[in-house]
Amino acid sequence: LVELAHKQMGGLNGLINNAGILRDGLLVKKDRETGAVKKLSKDQWDAVIGVNLTGATLLTRDFVAKMVETNTRPGVVVNMSSVARHGNRGQSNYTAAKAALAANTVTWAREFAAYGVRVGAVAPGMVETPMTAGMNQKARDALVAAIPVGRIGLPEDLWLAVKFVLECDYFNGRTIDVDGGLSM
């Protein structure tokens, strides 16, 4: 993918790791009626870790390797983490992947600084998407009531944070929470 993008665009200087999936489920759940114990499947775990963490890691590796090979400077990687990295019930796999991505933001910033590549992350809270548009109205209202700015985020809110990471050459190794103050 990096080779193709480099060839088609005549070079690269930025990467936004924005792929992500959810496969929600409690790690362990006891059925109230039958007493049966259900466990989060390895497939559910692997799917989320594979896309949200492994995919971003391998793409970052290939991007930075290309920057080093071509002696391109400066460069920047933006990781899309999530405020869920602080822990969400029923999202062990998603939380682990997004927390690891935020941790790797710091690690990679330290590793890649010698190559002129900065790394930052943006951690969205709830954002208007087809998924949130389909939420039960009562649940949606309760969520909005808990957000100090009184609304669900918009894609434009995230873009402003991503744009900041891309453009501010003094920003490195940190994660910006864009959640309307929900996690403060």
Task: Locate the predicted segments by residue.
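Conserved NAD(P)H cofactor-binding loop of Rossmann-fold oxidoreductase domains
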Residues: 19-26, 32, 180-181
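Active-site Tyr-X3-Lys motif and surrounding loop/helix of classical short-chain dehydrogenase/reductase
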Residues: 3-7, 26-50
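A short, exposed helix-loop element centered on a Lys and neighboring polar residues
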Residues: 60-61, 106
